[in-house]
Amino acid sequence: MLKMNLQFFAHKKGVGSTKNGRDSESKRLGAKRADGQFVLAGNILYRQRGTKIHPGVNVGRGGDDTLFALVDGVLKFERKGRDKKQASVYPVEAK
């Protein structure tokens, strides 16, 4: 009597799952205008979460802590005390 021992193997390898492979979109935070740059009223100066930079003279703070210019002028990033920074906009005189 003839006995055959047949073994069948998968023709596709089993594929495992992974819990990696996704990331959130960057929020494009940070300085939008440079120190000493001329800015117009309404220009966004700094996008941030929390108050890393505080609003100074002629600078407003939006609901998401974004800093924006209230008047036309020159932007200056300054120290505020020992451990804080602020952004101010100083109007330039007409010549």
UniProtKB/Swiss-Prot annotation:
One Pfam short name: Ribosomal_L27
Molecular-function GO term, any one: structural constituent of ribosome
Post-translational modification summary for this protein: The N-terminus is cleaved by ribosomal processing cysteine protease Prp.
InterPro entries linked to this entry: Ribosomal_bL27, Ribosomal_bL27_CS
Keywords linked to the UniProt accession: Ribonucleoprotein, Ribosomal protein
Alphabetical list of Gene3D superfamilies matching this protein: 2.40.50.100
Removed propeptide positions: 1-9
Keyword hit for Ribonucleoprotein: yes
Cellular component GO terms, alphabetical: cytosolic large ribosomal subunit
Annotated GO biological process: translation
Keyword Ribonucleoprotein: yes
Record NCBIfam families: L27
Family to which this protein belongs: Belongs to the bacterial ribosomal protein bL27 family.
Protein name: Large ribosomal subunit protein bL27
Organism listed in the record: Lachnoclostridium phytofermentans (strain ATCC 700394 / DSM 18823 / ISDg) (Clostridium phytofermentans)
